[in-house]
């Protein structure tokens, strides 16, 4: 690339003040280098440079930001107050869609569509993956 990393960031902006509250690199180059590129080089993986992104975040009333738009096949949850990554899960392939949430029987779920083959070297496949959020304490 012609620019220095990071190549993707997640940024929180206070729209009333017009100020950036926090920002963080989004995505990790670990298994996303295509074999022809990776073979001749010895790169110290993972590289926390961020990956090109396709898709956007979902925000919850409880202050979580879910996003799966990166090329490293992960869905992540961040704390909206400080940008700290709280959770991540590996998906079958990249999630280039905005996650959504639904409730069944009092239990909250986050679901995301993954696939679409956004990168030439990415695994093909179209899947829907759902994650159950921890049950609320009684």
Label each region the model flagged:
Residues 1-138:
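A fold-level detector for beta-propeller and closely related beta-sheet-rich head/sensor domains
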